[in-house]
Curated annotation (Swiss-Prot):
The gene is zraP. Belongs to the ZraP family. It comes from Escherichia coli (strain K12). The lineage of its organism: Bacteria, Pseudomonadati, Pseudomonadota, Gammaproteobacteria, Enterobacterales. The keyword Disulfide bond applies. This is Signaling pathway modulator ZraP. Expression of the P.mirabilis transcriptional regulator PMTR in E.coli results in increased production of ZraP and increased cell resistance to zinc. PMTR has no effect on resistance to nickel, cobalt, copper, manganese or iron.
Amino acid sequence: MKRNTKIALVMMALSAMAMGSTSAFAHGGHGMWQQNAAPLTSEQQTAWQKIHNDFYAQSSALQQQLVTKRYEYNALLAANPPDSSKINAVAKEMENLRQSLDELRVKRDIAMAEAGIPRGAGMGMGYGGCGGGGHMGMGHW
């Protein structure tokens, strides 16, 4: 019985190690911080940082407004009875905010292309195709 228990424990440990190591092979070994990604020249790094800072400055207020509208939308849905005209109005405002954010993202992408910065390049988590979700730091292109 002891021998069977030891074998089972060893097998479980080996399985856990094997499953844990597979993430190292995902995306060609490029991890969260995009190790082994094509390096940017110092000019490209400077341009990337400026483009990123400009995008953040322009989009942060819109993102905060979107979060506020999302809370308002959820509160309106929780009301008894829900006011469909108010809910639709807030949903339309959220749609307009998302569209404005998308337009800013397109402008950012164009600026990066004009600066010769390859898609997926950048500094830090999410500025590459590492399989995250969402925008602004989560790797969606």
